[in-house]
Swiss-Prot record:
It comes from the Eukaryota. It is found in: Mitochondrion; Nucleus. Its main location: mitochondrion. Belongs to the MAD2 family. Forms DNA polymerase zeta with rev3. It comes from Schizosaccharomyces pombe (strain 972 / ATCC 24843) (Fission yeast). GO terms for cellular component: cytosol; mitochondrial chromosome; nuclear replication fork; nucleus; zeta DNA polymerase complex. Keywords: DNA damage, DNA repair, Mitochondrion, Nucleus. The gene is rev7. InterPro entries: HORMA_dom (IPR003511), HORMA_dom_sf (IPR036570), Mad2-like (IPR045091). Gene3D superfamilies: HORMA domain. The lineage of its organism: Eukaryota, Fungi, Dikarya, Ascomycota, Taphrinomycotina. Required for DNA damage induced mutagenesis. Involved in DNA repair, mitochondrial DNA repair and translesion synthesis. Has a role in the bypass of abasic (AP) sites. This is DNA polymerase zeta processivity subunit. One of its GO terms (biological process) is error-free translesion synthesis.
Amino acid sequence: MENDTGWSVKKCIDIFGEFLLVSIHCILYARRLYPQDLFIKARKYNTIVWQSRHPILCEYIEEVVQSCIEELQTGSVHQVALSIINKEQREEERYVFSTDSIPIIPDFLLEKQISTNEPFTDAYVEYMRASLIQLLNITNGLPLIEQECTWTLRVTLKDGFPRPKQWEEWFLPPQARETDATRQFKGITIPVRNVDIGPMMTEIWVEKYTNSD
């Protein structure tokens, strides 16, 4: 049973996973990847967010995030990114969430309290509120995407870890696969407010692709 009096790695990851899920819904709404009438207003982290009401899309997002959470529990993930891809399979935008601070530990320690000196608090809610508000302001201020695009969730692994096979098969379009070590993003980078989840710190930023080579 998860310890409710202190922070555990699993608790940090679960809270991050929920934040990632909410962020994906908001980004898909703001960037108009689906008709906006498929989304409804909801409240999360003491602010207004947007949530898809289409059951198939909701199920898919939950499946993708759950697979991401399972990989995060191994401590192998450097960062998670929602990537918006155009019809030519070129990346238009990337929304990046760093996860470097998640340690590599045995499974049996995932629910163990990290430190008795750092009790569990809900202070992270305010970080998430501020970050989501800023993220929505940034996405709403970006130029509209002029053509039909799709999206995928990418994981970049820490050095020395192979890419999980299921990420190749399920979530990465064949033409969009990349070698993370050789990828150089050409465009602008917009920082978003960091989120602290207890001992876990997540940096967030937006990368906007430009057509210049």
